[in-house]
């Protein structure tokens, strides 16, 4: 992403996802200012979740697409989808903010979950969203990895305290790298 590079091939195909090679070769690219780019995600999974208690809570207090309103997560619907079930989590983090576990300015911690296994793995937690990161800047990427993991640990603690079935849970793993959604456009 930065530093000295040499490309010696006669022809290249830019498959970087960020138009890195196209930009270096002088192609016309555009990139919004960091504050205008889509937020990045830090994905993670938890283990030690009581599946039965977690699913019972989900059924007792189901989240819908209407619950996505506000914060970083918003979804535009025609209205008919508003009452449909969605694997969305916001309430544990709102409670954590109210109790001072999560700072008020981090009201962006919320999002979706994937599956909960019989072994107690709660997977594909897409709860941490970081604004103003330029995915073509190594310093921004490093800052995002550090801050994203810090926020993920807050999210794990909030889930343990405020989401039934997660009382004995712990971090299982992080995704390989921060999820960047938008950089350069050709």
Segments predicted by a language model, with ranges:
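Flavin (FAD/FMN)-binding glycine-rich loop and adjacent Rossmann-like elements that form
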Residues: 2-11, 15-186
């Amino acid at each position: 992403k930065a530093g000295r590079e040499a490309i010696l091939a006669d022809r290249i195909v830019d498959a970087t996802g960020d138009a890195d090679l196209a930009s270096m070769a002088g192609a016309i690219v555009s990139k919004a200012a960091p504050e205008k780019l889509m937020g990045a995600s830090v994905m993670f999974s938890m283990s030690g979740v009581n599946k039965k208690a977690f699913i019972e809570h989900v059924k007792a207090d189901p989240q819908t697409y209407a619950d996505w309103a506000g914060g970083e997560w918003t979804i535009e619907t025609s209205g008919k989808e508003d009452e449909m079930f969605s694997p969305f989590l916001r309430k544990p983090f709102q409670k954590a903010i109210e109790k001072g576990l999560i700072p008020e300015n981090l009201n962006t911690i919320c999002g979706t979950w994937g599956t909960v296994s019989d072994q107690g793995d709660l997977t594909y937690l897409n709860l941490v969203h970081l604004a103003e990161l330029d995915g073509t800047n190594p310093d921004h990427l490093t800052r995002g990895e550090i801050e994203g993991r810090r926020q993920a640990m807050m999210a794990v603690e909030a889930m343990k305290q405020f989401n039934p079935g997660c009382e004995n849970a712990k971090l299982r793993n992080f995704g390989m790298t921060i999820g960047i959604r938008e950089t350069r456009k050709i």
